[in-house]
């Protein structure tokens, strides 16, 4: 039996793109068994899978203080596995930490959205026998197109002409990191002057997640964008730390003033750009894309699949013509959908079939057996968004007060030990889920869970599968 373990880092706040990525292995890998393991949940012991996959949300913990502890948790599982595969993203942040991890874990394959200047990011790994290959930041599948298409309004009936949400990254990552946001803001200002209705923001308070983002995009005729990424490497996060300290001490500094205070004279530079999953999201929603002229994919052409913007700042008058011509914009939308969505080229199924071929994961036509190492812990949460934070808070308070064993004894005796007045609101839930709460306590006491498992709102892959099935 070909057994693949997928180590992920899904949380309650995970973006849909992250969820789709983690679930794609269970849906599309076509091996005999897939076990999903949250890095903050139970780590299987005494198993020897054929392959282990580390998703990019797991590797994103490299910027957290608990990274080394998480590595120690999963290293025995990795070392028991012959085929070791990693899928990093945003490689330019804390890349030295990744490079050291890939080398020490004897990673076999690394799939990254960045396909140039890899020796700058990974000097140790590229000098060894680790194989690097390209992976996009996101792909499409049937669930993606069916789920998001329901929010797409007819093009002529959409209320907003131009819409976008984009992060304005700090200057320590170079000019490339700010390019997408700056282009969006500048073009929105020009479009507004031309009489178009615009809602473009780089503010964190305006972030739209999940269905709210797709409802917004599905009611927008045009969106503006560019490749994401960076042009400066922050090997161990020291530049990011300096930015945080400067912001704390000087909260009124502009981005330009902040950049002037950073010493970027001896930093490592390169082209660390990648195509954003927004291209697929916009196509799925039937939104016409206005993009910085660039090479996105072979055959993806300006004026045919997207409306181009030139980097010099001047806007071709034909851009305004397209924005005023619903029929012409519709032709570009349909062409982009045909290119991005209606072939197998950018599907998870095709990509993961290629990954399996390159890494030696044996494929089968049989139905994949899907399991989750922490599924029984997630049962107590159910469909309520309030239960998990309360449960984690309750158990954390019990640990800090040194009464966890007493809480356990009371639960086993059929009683609920309330630690503060707000706990009374959950009495009924505790009454019906006593045995499941005891599993959390046992998990912590046995070492299957760590204190961060009671702080970070992590979720199992199976819980997201259940919620998608229920829609």
Regions found by a protein language model. Name each.
Residues 28-29, 76-83, 189-198, 285-286:
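A structural motif corresponding to the C-terminal end of an alpha-helix
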Residues 150, 316-454, 458, 468:
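C-terminal amphipathic helix plus adjacent low-complexity
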Residues 7-9, 49-60, 162-169, 226-229, ...:
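Short loop/turn segments at strand-loop or loop-helix junctions that form parts
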Residues 37, 71, 95-96, 207-210, ...:
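Structural motif corresponding to alpha-helix initiation and N-cap regions
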Residues 3-128, 143-148, 451:
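Extended catalytic core of nucleotide-activated donor transferases of GT-like folds
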Residues 34-40, 88-91, 197-209, 294:
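Acidic carboxylate-rich catalytic motifs and surrounding loops in phosphoryl-/glycosyl-chemistry enzymes
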Residues 8-11, 16-29, 33, 86, ...:
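Catalytic binding pocket for nucleotide-activated donors in carbohydrate/polymer assembly enzymes
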């Amino acid at each position: 039996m070909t057994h693949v373990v997928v180590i992920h880092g899904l949380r309650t706040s995970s973006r849909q793109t992250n969820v789709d990525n983690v679930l794609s292995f269970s849906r599309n890998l076509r091996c005999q068994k897939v076990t999903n393991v949250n890095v903050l949940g139970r780590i299987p012991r005494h198993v020897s899978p054929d392959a282990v996959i580390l998703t990019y949300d797991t590797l994103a913990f490299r910027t957290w203080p608990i990274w080394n502890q998480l590595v120690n948790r999963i290293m025995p599982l990795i070392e028991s596995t012959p085929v070791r595969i990693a899928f990093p993203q945003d490689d330019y942040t804390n890349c030295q930490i990744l490079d050291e991890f890939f080398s020490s874990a004897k990673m076999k394959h690394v799939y990254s959205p960045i396909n140039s200047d890899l020796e700058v990011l990974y000097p140790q790994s590229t000098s060894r026998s680790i194989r690097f290959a390209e992976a996009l930041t996101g792909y499409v599948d049937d669930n993606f197109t069916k789920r998001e298409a329901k929010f797409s309004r007819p093009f002529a009936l959409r209320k907003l002409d131009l819409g976008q949400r984009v992060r304005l990254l700090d200057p320590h990552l170079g000019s490339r990191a700010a390019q997408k946001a700056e282009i969006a803001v500048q073009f929105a200002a020009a479009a507004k002057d031309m009489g178009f209705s615009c809602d473009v923001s780089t503010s964190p308070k305006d972030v739209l997640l999940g269905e709210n983002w797709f409802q917004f995009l599905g009611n927008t005729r045009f969106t503006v964008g560019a490749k994401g990424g960076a042009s400066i490497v922050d090997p161990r996060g020291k530049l990011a730390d300096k930015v945080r300290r400067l912001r704390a001490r000087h909260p009124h500094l502009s981005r330009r003033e902040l950049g002037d205070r950073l010493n970027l004279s001896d930093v490592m530079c390169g082209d660390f750009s990648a195509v954003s999953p927004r291209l697929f999201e916009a196509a799925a929603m039937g939104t016409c894309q206005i993009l910085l002229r660039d090479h996105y994919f072979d055959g993806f052409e300006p004026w045919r699949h997207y409306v181009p913007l030139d980097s010099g700042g001047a806007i071709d008058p034909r851009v305004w013509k397209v924005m005023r011509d619903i029929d012409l914009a519709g032709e570009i939308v349909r062409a982009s959908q045909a290119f991005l969505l209606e072939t197998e080229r950018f599907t998870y199924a095709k990509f993961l079939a290629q990954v399996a071929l390159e890494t030696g994961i044996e494929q089968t036509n049989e139905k994949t057996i899907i399991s989750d190492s922490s599924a029984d812990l997630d049962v107590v949460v159910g469909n309520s968004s309030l239960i998990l934070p309360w449960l984690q808070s309750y158990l954390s308070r019990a640990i800090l007060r040194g009464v966890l064993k007493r809480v356990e004894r009371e639960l086993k005796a059929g009683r609920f030990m309330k630690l503060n007045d707000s706990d009374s609101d959950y009495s009924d839930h505790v009454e019906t889920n006593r045995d499941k709460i005891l599993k959390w306590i046992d998990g912590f006491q046995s070492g299957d869970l760590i204190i961060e498992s009671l702080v970070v709102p992590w979720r199992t892959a199976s819980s997201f599968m259940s919620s998608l099935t229920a829609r």
